[in-house]
From Swiss-Prot:
Subunit structure and binding partners: Homodimer.
Catalytic reaction annotation: aldehydo-D-ribose 5-phosphate = D-ribulose 5-phosphate
Keyword Coiled coil tagged: no
Residues reported to bind substrate: T34, G35, S36, T37, D89, G90, A91, D92, K102, G103, G104, G105, K129
CDD domains: RPI_A
Similarity comment: Belongs to the ribose 5-phosphate isomerase family.
Gene name of this polypeptide: rpiA
Alphabetical GO biological process terms: D-ribose metabolic process; pentose-phosphate shunt, non-oxidative branch
The entry's keywords: Isomerase
Sample GO molecular function, one term: ribose-5-phosphate isomerase activity
Protein name: Ribose-5-phosphate isomerase A
Record's function text: Catalyzes the reversible conversion of ribose-5-phosphate to ribulose 5-phosphate.
InterPro entries listed in its UniProt record: NagB/RpiA_transferase-like (IPR037171), Ribose5P_isomerase_typA_subgr (IPR020672), Ribose5P_isomerase_type_A (IPR004788)
SUPFAM superfamilies: D-ribose-5-phosphate isomerase (RpiA), lid domain (SSF75445), NagB/RpiA/CoA transferase-like (SSF100950)
Amino acid sequence: MTQTNDSPSIKAKKAAALKAVEFVQDQMIIGLGTGSTIAYFIEALGKRCQAGLKITAIASSERSMRQARLVGIPIVDSDTILELDLTIDGADEIDPLKQMIKGGGGALLREKLIASASKEMIVVIDETKLVNKLGKFPVATEISIFTFRHIVKKLKDHGYCGSLRVNQDQSLYRTDNGNYIFDICFPEPIDNPIFEHNRLKSFAGVLETGLFFNLAGRVIIGYQNGMTKIVA
């Protein structure tokens, strides 16, 4: 993981990811998040496993699972896990109360389930993800494919502006759970993320939102100069 030719942004992500690996100990059951920063974490964790670290892990996405297996991290079936020791995941935005927007990578439902099943969730970010208030980044909302157009219409009728996520070929994006994502764009910063989450979840067909709260433990911030800071 040489940093010689890395951009400042990549240097920040790698710095945070490498620091996070230090918190993983032998015999732990680890939850693996999804995203660009977590990809660096998985790469570094794989090297520790190759050097003798004994852990097991579950992944929040097929993408993270494939990468983990490729670098030698033992992956177990999520159905066998009652509790995880630690989840390492990123965020699209995080505020001073450790409320987050997640889901840019499309794995919000599994990410929230894994975090909820963990003794601690360590959030790994670069400095650009720090915000005073959430809302500049779209809020991913996972919705059922059954009557999905009605669900989207209902959300729009109640003032939620956004669009269904699509692939590069403009086909509708499907999550690993087989659902669609409606990305909601808030016109102003979100004053009460918990209220918005609960309101969205009250609509039939809304399975999960990318608003995360009461889940983050320590936060590892990577900076473009290669330094890190840990917020307890």
